[in-house]
Amino acid sequence: MLIFFNKYLHINLNILSYIPYRAIFSLLTSFFINLYIGPYFIYYFKKLQKYQIIRNNGPKTHYSKKNTPTMGGIFIIFSILFSTILYCNLSNIYIWYVISILIGYGLIGFIDDYKKIKYKNSQGLKLKWKYFFLSIIAFIFICMIKINNKDIISTELIIPFCIKNDFEINYLYVFLSYFVLVGTSNAVNLTDGLDGLAIMPVIFLTCGLTLISLFSDNINISHYLHVHYVKNSTELAILCMAIVGSGLGFLWFNSYPAKVFMGDVGSLALGGSLGAIAILLHQELLLIIMGGIFVFETISVILQIISFKIRKKRIFQMAPVHHHYEVKGILEPLIIVRFWIVSLILLLISLISLKVC
């Protein structure tokens, strides 16, 4: 929006023409918005008794969290949208693709959270309907980018740590994009089980995507680093920084002991947005490395279900795996910080892959 005012109202703020400055302003704006509205949101939702529903078969240590308000993802989404609309060039179609996922998946998460609170159970929206709506939005997103944008119509798959790192997969790319969107959103959702556990890996992952979006817009740098050239992808860096700032602002209140949880409205929206950005940048497989914590959590749930159905035995004492460590007696803050450390290491490994061959 500021770009529009600067151009057509002749304000002549040259600083707005530089991506790094707009990215920094975007981060700071979303961060301070969350710092400002966070306490009001927490107070209001406590007053309305919009508390996190604790499942009966969960860790006993979680019973102390039952009076913690949830749906903090609402102010995460708000601050991201505000900063994005304020600082991004809104004529860039990539921005609207990600915003559509942010809002669409956030709405599904909101309905899920609302049903949990209203009926006071941890089930929320039925699983089949949840995946149905997530899938519908995912396929609409994929169709839109295929129809409207030739720059990302390529169906080449970029494989990290590979000398010949681009492979044509044709129509399989549609299914890959679908699994990236739906899978990432649910992976973040599964990871969001401890105070601050999910948001910091989200921040790390987003920082990685920020760098790639900057590299991808330069044909020489993208060729040198073996990343897909995506024209005008630098605007995504500003959106990414809005996510980082919002995440840091949310972590201010979500760090142990948490004063608010993001709920499904936040986890589905953030996960879906990261998946969408990775698809636009053709970094679907690198996303798996960057978001290895989310992958690990998801695999732990899948293995637990398969093992119990086939062997009638559990691999983990409780899934997702962060609950397994809780049941073993490891303190929650210790689990959280160790997961953060692993997430940071995975980010660094993923960045090394850009020029390893």
UniProtKB/Swiss-Prot annotation:
It is an enzyme of class 2 (transferase). Pathway: Cell wall biogenesis; peptidoglycan biosynthesis. The keyword Amino-acid biosynthesis does not apply. Coiled coil: none annotated. The keyword Cell division applies. This is Phospho-N-acetylmuramoyl-pentapeptide-transferase. One of its GO terms (biological process) is peptidoglycan biosynthetic process. Pfam families: Glycos_transf_4, MraY_sig1. InterPro entries: Glycosyl_transferase_4, PNAcMuramoyl-5peptid_Trfase, PNAcMuramoyl-5peptid_Trfase_CS. It is found in: Cell inner membrane. The gene is mraY. One of its GO terms (molecular function) is UDP-N-acetylmuramoyl-L-alanyl-D-glutamyl-meso-2,6-diaminopimelyl-D-alanyl-D-alanine:undecaprenyl-phosphate transferase activity. GO terms for cellular component: plasma membrane. Its cofactor is Mg(2+).
